[in-house]
Amino acid sequence: MTNKYLVEGSENELTTKTAAELAGLIHSREVTSREVTQAHLDRIAAVDGDIHAFLHVGQEEALNAADDVDKRLDAGEAPASALAGVPLALKDVFTTTDAPTTAASKMLEGYMSPYDATVTRKIREAGIPILGKTNMDEFAMGSSTENSAYGPTHNPWDLERTAGGSGGGSSAALAAGQAPLAIGTDTGGSIRQPAALTNTVGVKPTYGTVSRYGLIACASSLDQGGPTARTVLDTALLHEVIAGHDGFDATSVNRPVAPVVQAAREGANGDLKGMKVGVVKQFDRDGYQPGVLEAFHASVEQMRSQGAEIVEVDCPHFDDALGAYYLILPCEVSSNLARFDGMRYGLRAGDDGTRSADEVMAYTRAQGFGPEVKRRIILGTYALSVGYYDAYYLQAQRVRTLIAQDFAKAYEQVDILVSPTTPTTAFKLGEKVTDPLEMYNFDLCTLPLNLAGLAGMSLPSGLASDTGLPVGLQLMAPAFQDDRLYRVGAAFEAGRK
């Protein structure tokens, strides 16, 4: 199977080039940022009726930002960043002052934020035009974008299948040539899982290294913004733009940004000699799609052929990660989403003079939240209630500690861990929507990393022999060793060419 949206490209070859290539053309003045931005806006107009990657397209704002870059470059100024002038798609969970921020929920339909998220601000300061805001599962709760209040995103590889979630819009935009760069968020795999299903690269940085200020919270101890692109180098260049300490975020870590771009360039030689790669025993067993396991084993053998030493690693508490995650996350959701009460901002329903304030609040939440969000609020509220807090929430936090200890022990033996990113390739839209537990299981390989706050990457590892659809290879690195992801990821990418 091929991705006709990218393989066949479009009338304009600018939409099939990498971000690094586009930056080189713009900075050398062979093309203008306006030309590149307009090409991608035209591409969005041509194919987004099929894909539905975007919830909002800001044509005027994007072109104005591109013109500003061109003006500065023509005046002889140095580029504001290595990606200045290259346009980007932004997940609709980061606040923006010039475009609606809805988190794909009716609760925030049409909401205009009075401030930019720190990630948004850094993108603007880097001279990167924002093409628009991408589709997602409502409040980042889901694995397929089917929980979006505005309809699902379709996978460019097969329009009947999901592009993943929660950030399926960002990855689909990359895969369809609608954007060369995109930003996502990852709570339990929402960057890495869509990347795997769309044959793109997605990175969940170490927790605390990318600011969450202005990121609409799902689960505050798990959420992390991160970069996505079509190549490892492009992803590294964007990572460098958005990472860094932020005084507006109490969980932001004050330490130097890992040298991710340097690592990606060094890894491009394809050499993995001296690298110890751990294969996680719990993620390499029967029950996964045969084509996924076949591609994973081929990827491991490729790394061996590139000089890596392969070691099997046992992480026994990973088997308990799913249960712990789906207790901790709903508890944090229950707390975070209490702010959407119909009183201060967002939707206010049923305020016709016949209802009390409490009734208006209840009616607003009933009308504004979708079924999955309500399910998680109820589950979290129950788990936090008197008599159940110790039995459920605290026990889940103990398991979380054990998972972090499993990772720590593993990194005493190896430099990096690998696994399939997802148990199967992209499933058909509607296939799992009536079975929440089946949907939750799809994040099995990705969520342990979030519980431990470590760094992870998904990158293309070929097509499954049984479905012809993309398979992702997941790399997992210790905290604050994000550059190791890029070193190994770039080498693996080079070895596949």
Swiss-Prot record:
Keywords: ATP-binding, Ligase, Nucleotide-binding, Protein biosynthesis
Recorded superkingdom: Bacteria
Active site: K91, S166, S190
A Pfam family: Amidase
Catalytic activity of the protein: L-glutamyl-tRNA(Gln) + L-glutamine + ATP + H2O = L-glutaminyl-tRNA(Gln) + L-glutamate + ADP + phosphate + H(+)
Region (Disordered): 143-171
Any Gene Ontology CC annotation: glutamyl-tRNA(Gln) amidotransferase complex
Function: Allows the formation of correctly charged Gln-tRNA(Gln) through the transamidation of misacylated Glu-tRNA(Gln) in organisms which lack glutaminyl-tRNA synthetase. The reaction takes place in the presence of glutamine and ATP through an activated gamma-phospho-Glu-tRNA(Gln).
Assembly behavior: Heterotrimer of A, B and C subunits.
Family per record: Belongs to the amidase family. GatA subfamily.
PANTHER family to which the protein is assigned, alphabetical: GLUTAMYL-TRNA(GLN) AMIDOTRANSFERASE SUBUNIT A, TRANSAMIDASE
The protein's name: Glutamyl-tRNA(Gln) amidotransferase subunit A
Source organism per UniProt: Corynebacterium glutamicum (strain R)
Taxon lineage: Bacteria, Bacillati, Actinomycetota, Actinomycetes, Mycobacteriales
